[in-house]
């Protein structure tokens, strides 16, 4: 894939499973894009982190990072969620917004059978330490325009959208983007989140995950660890390290 492929879009998601913000440039830290997955909403009773898998309503709120490192959350009705009570009222359960600096367990749930979700079991899994990534090997996620085709890139919540094709071939290699160097280590296995309805007119579509399972071994996008930190920008060219 390396050779002339550029960054088409950059995205970060300050609060896990909420809509994120599109950026022109961003610093890359050891934990991924600065401000990415720095907060998560937790169910107080169960102690589990909530995601759009179990609570699809999350995908209709949005978050952006403030200059002071806090997250500004906008609820589906356009109002701001200033505290845990507001979030709890919205979701109809007692919840708490927690930051990546806390010692909260990184435990979430995924549905076992997305085709029969209403009767399926749910399986707990442990995510990465520090920033609230699902996979410790995917601090930065990359996907190409060719791979997603006509699908909205927001379904896959990747950080870097590359204008090209063939990101799977990067697995096992080191690449440069702007000032950053990444070690691409894995293909990202997809889940029911990709089928969810979202803000902005994205409709529920089980065929998305069916297609990924059938044609791509259930994987779409690649995950990377950060070797060298630095700033990346839209238009930066992917290079070999």
Give names to the regions the model predicted:
Residues 1-241:
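Metal-cofactor-dependent catalytic cores
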